Each structure stands twice: as C-alpha cells, then as structure tokens.
C-alpha cells in the first residue's frame, strides 16, 4: 500500500504529567486517531514522544496535548520539534516506551484491569 501525506513531529509536555496516567491517555487518544509513534516519561519530569499520521489527525492530537491530557494532569506547555513530511510510516502503531527511571514493565494494552497501579 502506498503511503503519502504522512507528517511527523516530536513533542515534550511540561507540567504535572507524570503519575497522572498521562501516557495511558495519550496512547488511547493516538490510537483513536490512527496515529503511530510513542511516548515516555523523561527523567526531567516531562512526557516526551513522537507522533506520525495524517495532518488533520496530527492537529487534533497536538491540540489534545496542549489542552486536555489526562483528567489529573496540569499542562503548562508543550514543545513540538522536528516537524516534517514523510514518505512512509516509521512505526506500526503507537506505544508507551518503558520509563527510564523505573524498573518495572509498562502495560500497553487498553482496558487492562490488572494495571491500575501504573504511575504514568
């Protein structure tokens, strides 16, 4: 299948975004929009990530990252970088990368009732 009109960018969300299920909500939103890429907690207390998809869905996700997030999050600002148009997708789906400063697995599945302790 030929892929065209794929846009991508990196993002970093600042504010109270760790320990409030931000990554899990970002995963759900990205999957709902058909976006691909990843997100993860950073050692700086932010959530970083990469998204790729069609421009209209990318715009919706960027607005969600700026204004919505998870119910308990408090977003101060979002920085977008490395915005470009691509020939094809680089990822098969959207996923949560393991937390660099924790030593436990991250559950990526939606609706998993056994992972409520995840500190996103």
UniProtKB/Swiss-Prot annotation:
Broadest EC class assigned to this enzyme: hydrolase
Enzymatic reactions: an acyl phosphate + H2O = a carboxylate + phosphate + H(+)
Keywords: Acetylation, Cytoplasm, Hydrolase
Keyword Hydrolase: yes
SUPFAM superfamilies: Acylphosphatase/BLUF domain-like
Sequence ranges assigned to domain Acylphosphatase-like in this UniProt record: 8-98
Pfam name, any one: Acylphosphatase
UniProt xrefs under InterPro entries: Acylphosphatase (IPR020456), Acylphosphatase-like_dom (IPR001792), Acylphosphatase-like_dom_sf (IPR036046), Acylphosphatase_CS (IPR017968)
Name of the featured protein: Acylphosphatase-1
Taxonomic lineage from the root: Eukaryota, Metazoa, Ecdysozoa, Arthropoda, Hexapoda
């Amino acid at each position: 299948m030929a892929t065209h009109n794929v846009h991508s960018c990196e993002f970093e969300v600042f504010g109270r975004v760790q320990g409030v299920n931000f990554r899990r909500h970002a995963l759900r939103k990205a999957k709902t929009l058909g976006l691909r890429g990843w997100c993860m907690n950073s050692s700086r207390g932010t959530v970083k990530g990469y998204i790729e998809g069609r421009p209209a869905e990318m715009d919706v996700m960027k607005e969600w990252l700026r204004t919505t997030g998870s119910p308990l999050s408090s977003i101060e600002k979002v920085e977008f970088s490395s915005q470009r148009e691509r020939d094809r997708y680089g990822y098969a789906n959207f996923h949560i990368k393991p937390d660099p400063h924790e030593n436990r697995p991250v559950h990526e599945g939606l609706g998993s009732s056994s992972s409520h302790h995840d500190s996103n």
